[in-house]
């Protein structure tokens, strides 16, 4: 099987590519500027533009499935809404047309976002695509929903996976500083381990007949329903750092919540790992002496000053 992966150079893309490679698939990636880190010649690289029909036509030729992740994300979407629409909506339209023009039916897996629901602080039950209306509050969320609707209205076979936010394999200081404080500490969130997310994508392709023409929520499941402060506390605690002071965090509700993933779990059986597993995985990516130094010495003595500077 040959799988085309768009958006492979993003934070999540290399994991998805490796998942298919481990399963024995050939992976083709459509890249605009950046190479996929750490994969080298393991993937077939095609250079092009997701919004250009010629580029996409060449990329889909001869593939057996398409996983479409390429997108402009926040905060860039809010600064450049026209670019966001051109890539997130226009790029999806271009892929739809290219697949349709192939004249054969292949699995098309679209990676959408739980942000299409909008903020839901008054929700009394876990969110589900079939029960809850979408009320996107950002340019990013609106473009993802518009792309979803294009796919449903098309004549191609598809599955739409609405992902809860998936944390990066590695966390850098710049990532923390840019994103940590935009969500209120008490906001409901549902953790989804990166390996569970990639498994859901892999199984969506391998068992496409069971998920075809569905919109599925992908997240960690009932045991991973927490508050945002729990996620921050766990991530920083890996490095011996305390929770930053409350005043640094946003107060307006964020477009995250708890989700009903019973259908996706029944069909794909992908929920294997937890937030605790992620903390261990995160620590393992750094030298053990560094983690020990942070947890035993730097964190206890300087941690409260470090987090105030974030």
Regions found by a protein language model. Give the residues of each.
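N-terminal Rossmann NAD(P)H-binding glycine-rich loop of SDR-like oxidoreductase domains
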Residues: 3-23
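Substrate-positioning beta->alpha
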Residues: 182-206, 214
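Glycine-rich NAD(P)-binding loop of the Rossmann-fold in SDR/ketoreductase-type enzymes
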Residues: 51, 83-94, 134, 138, ...
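Conserved Rossmann-fold NAD(P)-dependent oxidoreductase catalytic core, especially the SDR/UDP-sugar
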Residues: 72, 93-139, 159
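NAD(P)H-binding glycine-rich loop region in Rossmannoid oxidoreductase-like domains
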Residues: 36, 47-87, 119
């Amino acid at each position: 099987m040959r799988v085309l992966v768009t958006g492979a150079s993003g934070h999540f893309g290399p994991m998805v590519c490796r998942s298919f490679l481990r399963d024995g698939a050939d992976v083709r990636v459509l890249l605009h500027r950046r190479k996929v880190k750490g994969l080298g010649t393991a993937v077939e690289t095609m250079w092009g533009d997701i919004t250009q029909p010629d580029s996409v036509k060449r990329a889909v030729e001869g593939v057996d499935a398409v996983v479409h992740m390429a997108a402009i994300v926040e905060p860039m979407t809010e600064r450049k809404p026209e670019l966001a629409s051109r890539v997130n909506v226009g790029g999806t339209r271009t892929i739809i047309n290219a697949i349709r023009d192939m004249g054969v039916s292949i699995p098309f897996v679209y990676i959408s976002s739980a942000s299409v629901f909008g903020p839901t602080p008054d929700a009394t039950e876990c969110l589900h695509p079939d029960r809850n209306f979408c009320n996107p509050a950002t340019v990013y969320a609106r473009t993802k929903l518009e792309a979803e609707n294009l796919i449903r209205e098309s004549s191609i076979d598809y599955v739409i996976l609405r992902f809860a936010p998936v944390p990066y394999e590695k966390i850098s200081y710049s990532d923390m500083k840019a994103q940590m404080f935009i969500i209120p500490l008490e906001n409901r969130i549902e953790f989804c381990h990166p390996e569970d997310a990639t498994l859901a994508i892999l199984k969506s392709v391998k068992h496409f007949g069971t998920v075809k023409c569905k919109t599925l929520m992908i997240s960690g499941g009932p045991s991973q329903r927490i508050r945002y402060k729990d996620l921050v506390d766990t991530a920083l605690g890996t490095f011996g750092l305390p929770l930053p002071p409350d005043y640094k965090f946003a107060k307006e509700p964020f477009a995250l919540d708890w989700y009903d993933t019973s259908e996706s779990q029944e069909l794909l059986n992908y929920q294997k790992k937890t937030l605790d597993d992620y903390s261990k995985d995160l620590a393992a990516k750094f030298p053990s002496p560094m983690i020990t130094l942070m947890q035993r010495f730097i964190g206890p003595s300087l941690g409260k000053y470090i987090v105030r500077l974030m």
